[in-house]
Curated annotation (Swiss-Prot):
Pathway assigned in UniProt: Cell wall biogenesis; peptidoglycan biosynthesis
UniProt EC number: 2.4.1.227
One Pfam family recorded for the sequence: Glyco_tran_28_C
Organism expressing this protein natively: Streptococcus pyogenes serotype M1
Keyword Cell membrane attached: yes
Superkingdom of the source species: Bacteria
Molecular function in Gene Ontology: undecaprenyldiphospho-muramoylpentapeptide beta-N-acetylglucosaminyltransferase activity
Family according to the record: Belongs to the glycosyltransferase 28 family. MurG subfamily.
Main subcellular location of this protein, as a coarse class: membrane
Protein name: UDP-N-acetylglucosamine--N-acetylmuramyl-(pentapeptide) pyrophosphoryl-undecaprenol N-acetylglucosamine transferase
Amino acid sequence: MPKKILFTGGGTVGHVTLNLILIPKFIKDGWEVHYIGDKNGIEHTEIEKSGLDVTFHAIATGKLRRYFSWQNLADVFKVALGLLQSLFIVAKLRPQALFSKGGFVSVPPVVAAKLLGKPVFIHESDRSMGLANKIAYKFATTMYTTFEQEDQLSKVKHLGAVTKVFKDANQMPESTQLEAVKEYFSRDLKTLLFIGGSAGAHVFNQFISDHPELKQRYNIINITGDPHLNELSSHLYRVDYVTDLYQPLMAMADLVVTRGGSNTLFELLAMAKLHLIVPLGKEASRGDQLENATYFEKRGYAKQLQEPDLTLHNFDQAMADLFEHQADYEATMLATKEIQSPDFFYDLLRADISSAIKEK
């Protein structure tokens, strides 16, 4: 019988990306791969879009909140149902292990796997743990972290960032679509790429729409998340979503304007790509992006600009400062030791799974 592994994680693209890096490696080595998530969640969309040989198991999901809400009462029942469904799935499949990338949907599968005696491995990308992973940690065999955790947690392994990027632009796949974009861009202007992520693109979209004069100063690439904004015109390329074109666009950009999600930040670090961070504030998140942005700025990897301060004047000042000190930023990023290859993490995870199975 083939070995089986369960993956879980969802809610945002960041809670799926690492899973999509690891899954093909397990499949290549003959593992049977299953995924537990929300059928209406981005995890289901991404798994289907990937075309990977993965069996998806849908469960009920409820949001975990730190504050009082009447919705909590309904969600308690959803989480309980999700736990029962997860127990059934894990008991039926009898996997060798479960790997979780976090998000609210991941808690019931993690608890179920632990209750049924299966090794549980979880990953935390942010400077501080979210509520879902704080709960999941109690049931985990091992937690891998991108950042060093300030608390002394016995089950934590500080890994660094696992990212799959091309540092060399010559390694990028050729794209006729990219060549078409270049036809509308000026070689005399710097190229800026705006990436807002699944939760934060709106502010960038509005900023670019409100300031058409940006096109006179820069070539603009804007990943919008909104197909109604799609446009290719002089010095402007707006597209709702990219997959194969994502890294070529990153390589094409002289500077990236991004939110503070750790996955994107560490991709930029791995590419030594100049970037400005405009993190989501506490009104739109739990404050993790503010922590990530401050960490990157203190390390000398990037500059940050708070969302309320995102005016044309402040933006132009930030651009001028970043380009003036570009060599310093790039040298600091190139010297980093915070990046790990997918192969390194896969080998580590496989070894830890084997050790956990032997210890049972």
